[in-house]
Amino acid sequence: MKFKLLTINPGSTSTKIAVFENEKEILSETLRHSSKELEAYKNIYEQFEFRKDTILKVLKDKNFNIQNIDAVVGRGGLLKPIVGGTYKVNEKMLKDLKAGVQGEHASNLGGIIANSIAEAFGVSAYIVDPVVVDEMEDIARFSGIPELPRKSIFHALNQKAVAKRYAKESERDYEDLNIIVAHMGGGVSVGAHKNGKIIDVNNALDGEGAFSPERSGNLPSGDLVRLCFSGKYTEDEILKKITGKGGFVAYHGTNNALDVQNAALEGDYDAKMTYNAMGYQVAKDIGSAAAVLDGKVDCIILTGGIAYNKLMTDFIAKKVSFIAPITIYPGEDEMLALAEGTLRVLSGQEEAKKYK
């Protein structure tokens, strides 16, 4: 049976939309929003009608008959911690997305816009594996300071999608596998997947774990505290150093990993050291995840935009291939991942979860 799905992925300055017929993409557009357009709105939620109307106008301009859709799926936002899966949008979810219970982010609009369009055409709206997916074991939450428990905020959508892709290609069930997934993009997350649950992962949103093109990664605690109280920086400036101006940005003034790689290949010693240091830290986190899984690892997956860079994947593979075979799925196809999650529900493979 064929299903037509509208997928919606709101970002800070753009909204990506795509239409799928099962897993085949038949329409894709990135709708850019100028800062001038967005300045008219006091907060993220106020952009809702503007973004929705823009989506409907583009679909009309493309002569797509939206009445033919079977479901609408939006990118999941900063909700309360939930287990992974596909969730049907309900009133409780809409309330929490509007309130920004874990912070304001453009992705909070995904479920809201999806629900509004779905209601107008008499179909259901869903979200799939938002960044707040939390399946961590209790032992993984300890940090060493009770007031600072470790949190699970990471690239859940792509982590789950590539792990399930590997399972499908291996003709095995995701729930029967132990997989380590290293997502490397603007941020880095390394997740230990055990029998269908991500039982330990770094908080990529706050820059925990390996450093990345724009995030600092783990820092020397004492030195960080002294920096905070040096009088040189405000709280916002310190937070920016950790997420936004850390990593490659701090060392080389760019968040483009390819620029750093090319400089390294051209003989720039500092660029080579920084580039390798990121790979070193990712490999170290993969080793830690292997310990979490008691050394029983079926596969290590390298994914995200930086997984296109052979210099990086080769460096990491050399260090961790003794643990398990390496599979590389470069990039992240978020729109397809949203569609696949919804298809699993519509086809009866999975049951939609209820947000509470």
Swiss-Prot record:
Q: Enumerate the InterPro entries for this protein.
A: Aliphatic_acid_kin_short-chain, Aliphatic_acid_kinase_CS, ATPase_NBD, Butyrate_kin
Q: What's the top EC group for this one?
A: transferase
What domain of life does the native source organism fall in? Bacteria
Question: So, what pathway does this thing act in?
Answer: Lipid metabolism; butanoate metabolism
Q: Which GO terms describe its molecular function?
A: acetate kinase activity; ATP binding; butyrate kinase activity
> What Pfam families does the record point to?
Acetate_kinase
Annotated GO biological processes are:
acetate metabolic process; butyrate metabolic process
Kindly give the Gene3D superfamilies that the UniProt entry links to this protein: 3.30.420.40
Q: Does the keyword Transferase apply?
A: yes
Q: What is its main location?
A: cytoplasm
EC no. given is 2.7.2.7
Q: Quote the catalytic activity from the record.
A: butanoate + ATP = butanoyl phosphate + ADP
* Keywords, ordered alphabetically: ATP-binding, Cytoplasm, Kinase, Nucleotide-binding, Transferase
What GO cellular-component annotations does this UniProt entry give?
cytoplasm
Localization annotation: Cytoplasm
Its family remark reads: Belongs to the acetokinase family.
Q: What does this protein do?
A: Catalyzes the conversion of butyryl-CoA through butyryl phosphate to butyrate.
Subunit and interaction comment? Homodimer.
Q: Which PANTHER family match?
A: ACETATE KINASE, BUTYRATE KINASE 2-RELATED
Task: Kindly provide the name given to this protein in its UniProt entry.
Answer: Butyrate kinase 2
Lineage, uppermost ranks: Bacteria, Bacillati, Bacillota, Clostridia, Eubacteriales
